[in-house]
Amino acid sequence: MDWLYRKTLGSIGSCSIETFPWPFYSFFQRIYISTPPGKPENSPETSATEVGEQRPSCLSASPVVEEEECEHRPEKNPTRQWPLDSGQGLTKGLKEKKLTPKRLQLLLVGKTGSGKSATGNSILGRQAFESKISARPVTTTFQKGTREFEGKELEVIDTPDIFSPQNQPEATAKKICDLLASPGPHAVLLVIQVGRYTAEDQAVARCLQEIFGNTILAYTILVFTRKEDLAEGSLEEYIQENNNKSLDVLDVACERRHCGFNNKAQGDEQEAQLKKLMEEVELILWENEGHCYTMEFPNVPSKTL
């Protein structure tokens, strides 16, 4: 356990722990607090559509994973192997059989020009969302596309430029509550272009936390576009050697969940990078026993709840 603590803190140099977002502390609380002292750890393709019609509220008191919407699957270790001293898994208290959603909702967020819509197209394996190089936002409404992947239905939600700091968090929260499909995302894909982590990207991450709450980062995966620009280097090397403390802090807050996308890739390469992304999604599901993120917007008027 000390190995994980030292390795994580060591990766961010002299940055003080007080600068970390709340999920960073939550991450270590799950490791340390959950273990008593002295004890060992134990569909056919559809076209993209605007999500503008009235939906059931995403704020529901009912369980986020319904029995009839899930399949039972034997418990297994997550894809990522954590080198814990006990040799056992990171998340504790999972049942031998757990609920695994048959439909997974992935929410794409990112600044204008990050490659967000192109990433959605890569995930879907077709041109479902309009994507082009532009200084102005191309996506102006919530859109979704679906595909089947390894027996699951993936629902990919592409978002307009609502995470800009110019927008009011309360108004943005209401839009999401009214328009986003119930019950909530199983994973948030924060799209960042390789070599271009700017103040705008940081603002998107902050706005994401303001809207959803700090715990949203426990469901967030960093997706780096233009992976092809890394040439012979790996994504891991890029993150470790970029000398951008803000990016490293965000990566730690997201528990080092990240992957790279070449949105020009086709065929086997395209499917391989989707598989890597889904391994990260599976890890989130494993840690949360199959539950999606329960969205709570305290600043939204009660009539929308």
From Swiss-Prot:
GO MF annotation terms: GTP binding
Region span, G4: 225-228
Region (G1): 110-117
Domain of life where this protein originates: Eukaryota
Subcellular location: Cytoplasm, Cytosol
Region (G3) residue spans: 158-161
Protein name according to UniProt: GTPase IMAP family member 6
Gene Ontology terms describing biological process: autophagy; cell redox homeostasis; defense response to bacterium; immune response; kidney development; lipid metabolic process; response to type II interferon
Tissue: Expressed in thymus (in thymocytes), spleen (in splenocytes), lymph node and lung.
Region (G2): 137-141
Family the entry assigns: Belongs to the TRAFAC class TrmE-Era-EngA-EngB-Septin-like GTPase superfamily. AIG1/Toc34/Toc159-like paraseptin GTPase family. IAN subfamily.
Xref: InterPro entries: G_AIG1, GIMA/IAN/Toc, P-loop_NTPase
Region span, G5: 262-264
Domain AIG1-type G: 101-302
A Gene Ontology term for the protein's cellular component: cytosol
Taxonomic classification: Eukaryota, Metazoa, Chordata, Craniata, Vertebrata
Residues where GTP binds: 110-118, 131, 226-228, 263
Keywords from the UniProt entry: Cytoplasm, GTP-binding, Nucleotide-binding
Region (Disordered): 37-91
